[in-house]
Amino acid sequence: MVKRYGCAGILLFAMGLFPLLAQDNAAAKEMAIKIADRIVASTVYEFKDVKTGKVYTSLDNVSLNPDMRVNSKYLNWHYTNGVTNMALMELGDKIQNRKYEDYVLKNMKFIFDKTNQSYFHRLYDKTFREGGWRAVPRLTWHMIYRNKRLDDNGPMGASLITLNQRHPDDALSKNILKQPIIILWFQNLVWPMEP
């Protein structure tokens, strides 16, 4: 798990160095940008059947398959990716470069693409019906649909709300309205909306 999300941790650490090491600000900034650029460059927008290895760029007309996964760890709906999204947007704000915010927007649009959501929501419903709660955690984006714990939508929901405030989008707004009120309250507490 540490290796899997190490880049996000390093990015957050590097960003934390900005104010602490004013004399070495250039090095911290350079490191944060290097890590962020690696994250952006390594993200692929496709799906993979982990059993057969077959890669799909679209889920149109693909049969429901519990072995289908998003093929980039940065597109998983996971706590660490929500934190990474917020860090990338903050980095973009600090260096006045929209590249990282545009990356997060592209990721969210991919996740909330109508075809992608339809596929994984139907797969979630089918898997839950057949196997209950214990069967769903292995599915891509199961946390979006399970929506029972703060970690299911906390940081990802916060990054989604922040992004949607900057780039209003019907597909993103639709998902925000599904979030539990506690998530919206927490997000507003941590990242208050402008008056």
Give residue spans per PLM region.
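Bacterial Sec-dependent N-terminal signal peptides
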Residues: 1-24
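Short secondary-structure capping/junction motifs at helix and strand boundaries
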Residues: 4, 167-177, 191-194
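A generic alpha-helix preference that emphasizes hydrophobic side chains
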Residues: 16-20, 81, 153, 181
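Low-complexity, Ser/Thr/Pro/Gly-enriched N-terminal "stalk/linker" regions
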Residues: 23-136, 170-174, 178-179, 185-187
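Flexible, active-site-adjacent loop/turn segments at secondary-structure boundaries
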Residues: 77, 148, 194
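Aromatic-rich carbohydrate-recognition surfaces in CAZymes
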Residues: 138-167, 176
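Short, charged beta->alpha transition segments
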Residues: 144, 181-182
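The feature captures the catalytic groove of carbohydrate-active enzymes
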Residues: 161-165, 184-195
